[in-house]
């Protein structure tokens, strides 16, 4: 083998090893890149019990139950699937039903997500992008989702000194 052939073989081998290493790293990070998984994603992936991940969605109205010693259970939903969550600790001040939440923990053998951290978004109109996409796909999306409370409806005009609304009323 000539020097040129040997050099090309070494360069080709190095590139192959680099490509394999990059593929292994990307494969290992594939699940870690997502900030959180929605209940639908968890159901589709069949996440193994004990595997840590972040769960995001909306706290299902009527599902919040408080127990002894700061124990709380609630359901996180994304419009498609619901996942029961158990947490023991102090909840954020802004945590409430219908609110966006991200919980970190793992599934137990019975399918309950055991959270050790719960975060609530400060904006009551917060909705994770994945949840909004799921709601749109399933036809449950309402146009006023994601707008601050009290926001003007399309076609309305502000009510400053004598201005008219779209309906024609004056102040």
From Swiss-Prot:
Residues given in the record as heme binding sites: 122, 126
Cytoplasmic side: 1-7
GO molecular function annotations of the record: heme binding; metal ion binding
Transmembrane feature ranges: 8-28
Keywords, alphabetical: Cell inner membrane, Cell membrane, Cytochrome c-type biogenesis, Heme, Iron, Membrane, Metal-binding, Signal-anchor, Transmembrane, Transmembrane helix
GO annotation terms (biological process): cytochrome complex assembly
Membrane topology annotation: Single-pass type II membrane protein
Main location, first listed in the record: membrane
Amino acid composition bias (Basic and acidic residues), ranges on this chain: 137-146
The keyword Protein biosynthesis is assigned to this record: no
One Pfam family from the record: CcmE
Start and end residues of each stretch annotated as Disordered: 137-171
GO CC aspect terms: plasma membrane
Subcellular locations according to the entry: Cell inner membrane
Periplasmic side: 29-171
InterPro entries recorded: CcmE (IPR004329), CcmE-like_sf (IPR036127), NA-bd_OB-fold (IPR012340)
Protein family per UniProt: Belongs to the CcmE/CycJ family.
PANTHER family: CYTOCHROME C-TYPE BIOGENESIS PROTEIN CCME HOMOLOG, MITOCHONDRIAL (PTHR34128:SF2)
Purpose: Heme chaperone required for the biogenesis of c-type cytochromes. Transiently binds heme delivered by CcmC and transfers the heme to apo-cytochromes in a process facilitated by CcmF and CcmH.
The name this protein goes by in its record: Cytochrome c-type biogenesis protein CcmE
Record organism: Bradyrhizobium sp. (strain ORS 278)
């Amino acid at each position: 083998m000539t020097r040129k052939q040997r050099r090309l073989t070494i360069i080709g081998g190095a590139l192959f090893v680099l490509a394999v290493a990059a593929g292994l790293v990307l494969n290992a990070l594939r699940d870690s890149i997502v900030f959180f998984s929605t209940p639908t994603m968890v159901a589709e992936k069949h996440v193994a019990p004990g595997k840590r991940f972040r769960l995001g969605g909306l706290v299902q109205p009527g599902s919040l139950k408080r127990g002894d010693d700061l124990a709380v259970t609630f359901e996180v939903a994304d419009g498609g699937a619901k996942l029961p969550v158990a947490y023991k600790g102090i909840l954020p001040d802004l945590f409430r039903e219908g609110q966006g939440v991200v919980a970190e923990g793992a599934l137990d053998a019975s399918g309950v997500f055991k959270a050790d951290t719960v975060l609530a978004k400060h904006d009551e109109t917060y909705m994770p992008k994945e949840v909004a996409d799921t709601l749109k796909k399933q036809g449950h999306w309402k146009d006023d989702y994601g707008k601050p409370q009290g926001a003007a409806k399309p076609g309305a005009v502000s009510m400053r000194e004598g201005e008219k609304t779209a309906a024609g009323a004056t102040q």
